[in-house]
Amino acid sequence: MLQLMKQLYEKPAVKWTCHTGFYLMILLVLFFMYGFHTANTGSYIYNDF
């Protein structure tokens, strides 16, 4: 089973798909952690100046 997975991962299309899916998952996790805010909804840090 492990040998089959290694053979599959050596194919460029499978490797590209795995890498793209991994980075897309990281991007989605970051979006959900920090939220989908527009530029006008965040707190403005220079209110007191």
Curated annotation (Swiss-Prot):
- Keywords, alphabetical: Cell membrane, Membrane, Transmembrane, Transmembrane helix
Could you list the residue ranges that cross the membrane?
A: 16-36
GO cellular component term, pick one? plasma membrane
Q: Where does the protein end up?
A: Cell membrane
Q: Which InterPro entries does UniProt cross-reference here?
A: DltX
Q: Which organism is it from?
A: Bacillus subtilis (strain 168)
Look up and give the membrane topology term: Single-pass membrane protein
Output this protein's name: Uncharacterized membrane protein YwzH
Q: Does the keyword Cell membrane apply?
A: yes
